């Protein structure tokens, strides 16, 4: 008996771009485990698996609250349709909540939701009230507060008629508005997951190494060539996944490492929120 449904196959196709039969086989071999199925499709050579998996059907916005150039907050507020995302009250609440986070520094989402907000109501109650008025579920998904020597932000609208759905914060060790802006736009466009190779967890590196080896074998590469092939593919992973390893979008002859070295700055932290993404 199959451990998956037709809806699971459809979802996996949307996430990976792989064919229906390939998705069915991957789900069968993985016992219905989505993560293992995606990994199996990567080994089989499905294109753009990771990039497609980041796509989302969620709606909502990313709100920004920034205090000068040393502190900023990003907050994601979700709704069910883009019609509500355009709603002034929805946008106002998101902006107010981002400001509230900036002032109160809650430790996590549950702490924020249970915090006293206004008129004896908690943040959760205020969200529920607006949800009842608008007629859609509204969810406060996440937030991040960054404080440091120099913090820059970048907000992006995927549709001019909608509020921002992508936001980036970058913390540098010293002020440099031009470089900070370039880095924020770089992060928005190419979505690195880590600052440098040193920041990539060992288990992630080992998993990429294992997938690279399995993929090379699937392609029929000779066993003696595997170490070199695997290292080459790992280097490609680091180039994509780390900010400092990426080519600079304004000048692809340079890496971001070279850009920050020339500017004499250090990237201490970055946050990238896109509506619906992890």
Curated annotation (Swiss-Prot):
UniProt keyword annotations, A-Z: Cytoplasm, Elongation factor, Protein biosynthesis
Principal localisation: cytoplasm
Cell compartments where the protein resides: Cytoplasm
Gene Ontology CC annotation, any one: cytoplasm
Involved in Mg(2+) ion dislocation from EF-Tu, as annotated region: 81-84
InterPro entries in the record: EF-Ts_dimer_sf, Transl_elong_EFTs/EF1B, Transl_elong_EFTs/EF1B_dimer, Transl_elong_Ts_CS, UBA-like_sf
GO molecular function annotation: translation elongation factor activity
Cysteine-cysteine disulfides: none
Family: Belongs to the EF-Ts family.
HAMAP family cross-referenced by the UniProt entry: EF_Ts
Purpose of the protein: Associates with the EF-Tu.GDP complex and induces the exchange of GDP to GTP. It remains bound to the aminoacyl-tRNA.EF-Tu.GTP complex up to the GTP hydrolysis stage on the ribosome.
NCBIfam families: tsf
Record-given protein name: Elongation factor Ts
Organism: Thermobifida fusca (strain YX)
Taxonomic classification: Bacteria, Bacillati, Actinomycetota, Actinomycetes, Streptosporangiales
Gene: tsf
